[in-house]
């Protein structure tokens, strides 16, 4: 079911072997679409921004966020500020990368794209104040 929801987009390079009667039939590349609830700071109004990244097998949500950080361009092709979030161990132990993924709180390091409905919606944990984007202030846990 999850594989059927992966979006396919044409590759950017033309292949002469795929042209049929003057039409450019480009092979399709699978992509992962993410809709991220963003917020510039704790006082600003939240907004949503969409991103599409190339699909890779066994990709987790945190790897998607790292790809967006490497290339911060939204699905409209506009350059944007990199998304911020917390992470630490990347081994499903610490919980620092926890966020709301498709309406459910879970760790982004263990959330595998193939097992998620697309588009994947990411939001900050609602029980903590937002610092920026998916990054929240957990300091009250340690008081």
Q: Model-found features: residue ranges?
A:
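Signature of N-terminal electron-transfer/Fe-S-associated modules in redox systems
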Residues: 2-143
């Amino acid at each position: 079911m999850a594989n059927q929801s992966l979006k396919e987009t044409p590759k950017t390079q033309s292949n002469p072997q795929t042209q049929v009667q003057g039409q450019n039939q480009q092979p399709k590349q699978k992509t992962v679409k993410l809709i991220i609830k963003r917020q510039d700071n704790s006082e600003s109004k939240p907004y949503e921004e969409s991103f599409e990244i190339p699909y890779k097998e066994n990709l987790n949500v945190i790897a998607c966020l790292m790809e967006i950080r490497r290339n911060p361009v939204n699905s409209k092709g506009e350059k944007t500020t990199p998304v911020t979030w917390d992470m630490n161990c990347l081994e499903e132990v610490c919980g620092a990368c926890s966020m709301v993924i498709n309406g459910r709180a879970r760790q982004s390091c263990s959330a595998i794209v193939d097992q998620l409905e697309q588009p994947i919606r990411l939001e900050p944990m609602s029980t903590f104040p937002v610092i920026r984007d998916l990054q929240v202030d957990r300091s009250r846990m340690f008081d």
